[in-house]
UniProtKB/Swiss-Prot annotation:
Lineage: Eukaryota, Metazoa, Chordata, Craniata, Vertebrata
BP-aspect Gene Ontology terms: cell chemotaxis; defense response to bacterium
Record-linked Pfam families: Defensin_beta (PF00711)
Record-linked SUPFAM superfamilies: Defensin-like
Disulphide bonds in the chain: 33-62, 40-55, 45-63
Keywords linked to the UniProt accession: Antibiotic, Antimicrobial, Defensin, Disulfide bond, Secreted, Signal
A molecular-function term among this protein's GO annotations: CCR6 chemokine receptor binding
PANTHER family xref list: BETA-DEFENSIN, BETA-DEFENSIN 103
Job of this protein: Exhibits antimicrobial activity against Gram-positive and Gram-negative bacteria.
UniProt GO cellular component terms: extracellular space
Record's protein name: Beta-defensin 103A
Amino acid sequence: MRIHYLLFALLFLFLVPVPGHGGIINTLQKYYCRVRGGRCAVLTCLPKEEQIGKCSTRGRKCCRRKK
């Protein structure tokens, strides 16, 4: 019977997300960027664009054309 508790604990440890890896947060930020009419840039925005937010926790920027 105690083996079930051990197996449950190991399964739980493997399913817990790693700290600093915000998969759900990054997905929501990308979606919010696209809803606002932007795109996700890896390094910097193009000269005719402005930064309107972030696309991920790792520093990708959400850029949109200047109005």
